[in-house]
Amino acid sequence: MLKRFPTPILKVYWPFFVAGAAVYYGMSKAADLSSNTKEFINDPRNPRFAKGGKFVEVD
């Protein structure tokens, strides 16, 4: 059995956890915006097609 030590993990590293969550959220939004641009909207690798999406007519 491992001995437990009162090491303050959350108290010390909370800024890194918050920053990691913010970066994850920002990259997710950037990827969504990028996949819906004119250049990539009809790419067969777009996740929209896995959900049954149709091709979009681009001007």
UniProtKB/Swiss-Prot annotation:
One annotated Gene Ontology cellular component of this protein: proton-transporting ATP synthase complex
Taxonomic superkingdom: Eukaryota
Topology of this chain in the membrane: Single-pass membrane protein
Principal subcellular localisation of the protein: mitochondrion
InterPro entries in UniProt: ATP_synth_F0_jsu
GO terms, molecular function: proton transmembrane transporter activity
Keyword annotations of the record: ATP synthesis, CF(0), Hydrogen ion transport, Ion transport, Membrane, Mitochondrion, Transmembrane, Transmembrane helix, Transport
Transmembrane stretches, start-end: 9-25
Pfam families xrefs: ATP-synt_J (PF04911)
Family assignment from sequence similarity: Belongs to the ATPase j subunit family.
Function summary: Mitochondrial membrane ATP synthase (F(1)F(0) ATP synthase or Complex V) produces ATP from ADP in the presence of a proton gradient across the membrane which is generated by electron transport complexes of the respiratory chain. F-type ATPases consist of two structural domains, F(1) - containing the extramembraneous catalytic core and F(0) - containing the membrane proton channel, linked together by a central stalk and a peripheral stalk. During catalysis, ATP synthesis in the catalytic domain of F(1) is coupled via a rotary mechanism of the central stalk subunits to proton translocation.
Subunit details: F-type ATPases have 2 components, CF(1) - the catalytic core - and CF(0) - the membrane proton channel. In yeast, the dimeric form of ATP synthase consists of 17 polypeptides: alpha, beta, gamma, delta, epsilon, 4 (B), 5 (OSCP), 6 (A), 8, 9 (C), d, E (Tim11), f, g, h, i/j and k.
Protein's name in the database: ATP synthase subunit J, mitochondrial
Origin species: Saccharomyces cerevisiae (strain ATCC 204508 / S288c) (Baker's yeast)
Lineage, highest ranks first: Eukaryota, Fungi, Dikarya, Ascomycota, Saccharomycotina
